[in-house]
Design a protein with these regions (language model features):
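Intrinsically disordered, low-complexity Pro/Gly/Ser/Thr-rich segments with frequent PxxP/GP/PP motifs
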Residues: 6, 10-12, 49-68
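Extended extracellular/luminal ectodomain segments enriched in beta-structured repeat modules
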Residues: 24-29, 94
């Protein structure tokens, strides 16, 4: 089985309390390797690891499923106490309420690119059975920004997750890397 690393590797310093790292999901699998201590691993939008979560023995790599790797181009933004994101038309909508998103690639106005923003409203724009685009409302206060200056040509919304880990006792490290897997598993 071969692994193709995707994105940056991250390190969590582990102890008997939960520690976490957040990342934009780019593939459906994450590989974790605990060093020096056994760990319990939790994955979710705002995960906190407990001793009842997935157990990984020290020095043993584990590959865990992240679910879908969702991203979508952004067609526009509307400012407010919560920011409304217009998704590209004709593409559907891979996101749902309570997903956590990273917004990137917006130029022309600083402050629209954000991390860890929760989707609070999902609004489909349909005519008959055809979906022509969708709107998402995220918990980002953009009242001080001017949407008219926002250039969304390369803008993207991407699903974000958290990996959390803790030990039973003592401290160590957990290496976290998103991977693509090929070959026999």
């Amino acid at each position: 089985m071969a692994h193709q690393p995707v994105g940056d590797s991250q390190t969590i310093t582990t102890s008997a309390t939960s520690a976490r790292v957040q990342f934009a999901v780019q593939t459906d699998t994450v590989r974790v390797v605990p060093i020096s201590q056994n760990v319990h691993v939790a994955i979710g939008t705002t995960a906190t690891a407990t001793t009842s979560d997935y157990f990984v023995p020290a020095g043993t790599p584990a590959t865990l499923n992240l679910g879908r790797a969702s991203s979508m181009g952004i067609a526009g933004v509307t400012t407010g106490a919560a920011t409304v994101i217009d998704l590209s038309e004709g593409m559907g909508n891979p996101f749902k309420v309570d997903d956590v998103l990273t917004i990137s690639g917006i130029t022309g106005e600083t402050g629209f690119n954000t991390t860890a923003k929760v989707v609070s409203i999902q609004e489909a724009r349909t005519i008959g059975y055809a979906q022509f685009g969708a709107k998402l409302t995220i918990d980002h206060d953009s009242r001080g920004l001017f949407a008219g200056d926002a250039v969304v040509t390369a803008a993207e919304a991407r699903r974000t997750l958290t990996v959390a880990a803790r030990t039973d006792s003592g401290s160590g490290k957990l290496y976290v890397q998103q991977v693509q897997i090929s070959g026999d598993q």
